Amino acid sequence: MAANTGIIKGNTHEWEMVVGLEVHAQVISNSKLFSGASTGFCSEPNTQVALFDVAMPGTLPVLNARCVEQAVRTSLALSCEVHKYSVFDRKNYFYPDLASGYQITQFYFPIATDGYITLDECCSKDVRISRIHLEQDAGKSMHVGDKTYLDFNRAGVALMEIVSAPDFRSPEEAAEYIKKLRIILRAIGTCDGDMENGSLRCDANVSVRKVGDSNLGARSEIKNLNSIKHLAQAIRHEACRQVEVLESGGVVSQSTMLFDVDTCTTRSMREKEDACDYRYFPDPDLLPLELTTAFIDNIRASLPELPSEKKRRYMQDIGLSRYDADILSSDKDVSAYFESVVAKHAPDLAVPWITGELFGALNKRGSSIADSPVSAGRLVELLDLVADGTISGKMAKQVFALMFETEKSASDIVREQGLCQITSEETLAPIVDRIISESPDEVAEYRQGKTKLLGYFVGKVMKETNGQANPGLVNTLIKRRLAED
């Protein structure tokens, strides 16, 4: 059986994947959705827990306005319709790390619906976002030997559940969607998008159908995928598994699956519940959430330039390639750094230094641009020295490496190392004359048409001057001298 992007070639038919994603994004907020407990990460277990978070009798939820603002901000950035009226419901189920026995969510009337994200890499399409709603996160169970320990630090942290329509037809489309969603959430400051630490988690609903069939097959839900790589692997394996079941005469059951990262396979966790199993009903302790037009408009006005808009501007106004525009618009810290540099220097000089030298050095160190020892202002200073001919491009790379290592300015390093470029014709002309007079055979060959020997003479001059001679001036002087009789 072969799988080619979203089409699986079985023994009897070609099958098409149909995938929808449910993303749980932790809201950036100082306190939880319904309590004043802190949301700080990496604290000691059970040190950030309010009485409400563990369902102590008599405690009541108090809605965090900041979390509502963040959900509206996200909804607007994803082109959703924000509803002025929404309701919090109780989703009833038992699990040890859910102390109340129910999760407060929004089932019947979510805060937003009908948005989209545009894919433009692996394909060109709009992926519909069916709904966005606010809900509580659960605590965390830790299994050690035959014991289970509960940490309620995460219990009650605000989540935005962002639910897509079943519009994906390949793992690659799903992966691109998560990348773009994460870039948007980071750009608007509503979620840090850190999948490794669980602040962005993804469930994938996967089914298959024969190519050309419009009916949807029974779906499996793969829970808690914590990397884009694992998401793509899980979707592909589960789709192929379902095809094998169907082609062998079996029936795909609606089930909840787990993805084993060691074997890259999915396995059944339990039969998937229907909505009726959760017995949703409006939470009697919370009034409906009613938003005003002014509240929504104020948040809309505060939205920053979105990454897709920034990418378009970089391509149309600055003239960047699609590739460079994509890299430089995908992170707000990178964008700010780039715009500071390009305000002083042309893009064709600034871009290679940022995407080449700077990114290369940061990757080796494992650092982000926010932690770069070479600030945008320091890089501008270095490029000033290149532009005015003080140092050559080759020298600049040496200076940059020292800047990155020592955090000194370019001017200080050039002065300390004696790296100023030699741009005086009076200084270079005698060196050129001597090298040419010492190379009669090479001069004769050059004058007979072997013009590639120009590089030989340039190299000799550069070696003589320890690489400090201005290459352009050296070329001019050598050509002029060799043209003489």
Curated annotation (Swiss-Prot):
SMART domains attached to this UniProt entry: GatB_Yqey (SM00845)
Gene3D superfamilies attached to this UniProt entry: 1.10.10.410, GatB domain, N-terminal subdomain (1.10.150.380)
Pfam families cross-referenced by the UniProt entry: GatB_N (PF02934), GatB_Yqey (PF02637)
Quaternary organization: Heterotrimer of A, B and C subunits.
Cross-referenced NCBIfam families: gatB, PRK05477.1-2, PRK05477.1-4, PRK05477.1-5
Function: Allows the formation of correctly charged Asn-tRNA(Asn) or Gln-tRNA(Gln) through the transamidation of misacylated Asp-tRNA(Asn) or Glu-tRNA(Gln) in organisms which lack either or both of asparaginyl-tRNA or glutaminyl-tRNA synthetases. The reaction takes place in the presence of glutamine and ATP through an activated phospho-Asp-tRNA(Asn) or phospho-Glu-tRNA(Gln).
Record-given protein name: Aspartyl/glutamyl-tRNA(Asn/Gln) amidotransferase subunit B
Originating organism: Anaplasma marginale (strain St. Maries)
Gene that this polypeptide is encoded by: gatB
